[in-house]
């Protein structure tokens, strides 16, 4: 009888510990569920210029202009740089390149307002013209990022909107709205060194491959969870 009593006491202690831990486990699960529900994406619109944005959003004309000018300034700092015009044209096509400003305060105009006919100067760098910009719809302060496109037939960025890191945002069509990670609107590092011909195209191809893999992985996870 004494042995049976000890066994019952041990069983009771295990049950009591399980009861005490249950609320803790539920609380931890709730924290992870809430973290998973936090918004990690941002709805953005893609435009070629401030006029396109203003026409689509008449009441936000000032915000459109601010976002456009911010993107132009970012383009100067973050666009890929080339040692020669030929290297830039090889990646982005004719009429898609301009000399990078020598002074930080200088901002190039968009591809619709600038030609690539400027003579090359000693020590200058070349960069693609900003072809459009991404504007966060719900974020204040004109949050935006410059977008580039290529007209070179063999470029993976041909006809696409890509950012300074080479990430692909689909067809270079103005007025599109899409959902992107919030990191897409985060500032990119300044580019002060030139890259070799074809280097940016390789970045675009690599980023596109990573995006496809991530999309496939997301679909697989959703199916496995019964989504």
Swiss-Prot record:
Biased composition (Low complexity): 212-227
Record-linked InterPro entries: Biofilm_formation_YgiB (IPR009576)
Disordered, as annotated region: 198-227
Short name of any one Pfam family annotated for the protein: DUF1190
Family affiliation: Belongs to the UPF0441 family.
Protein name (Swiss-Prot/TrEMBL): UPF0441 protein YPO0661/y3517/YP_2976
Protein species of origin: Yersinia pestis
Source lineage: Bacteria, Pseudomonadati, Pseudomonadota, Gammaproteobacteria, Enterobacterales
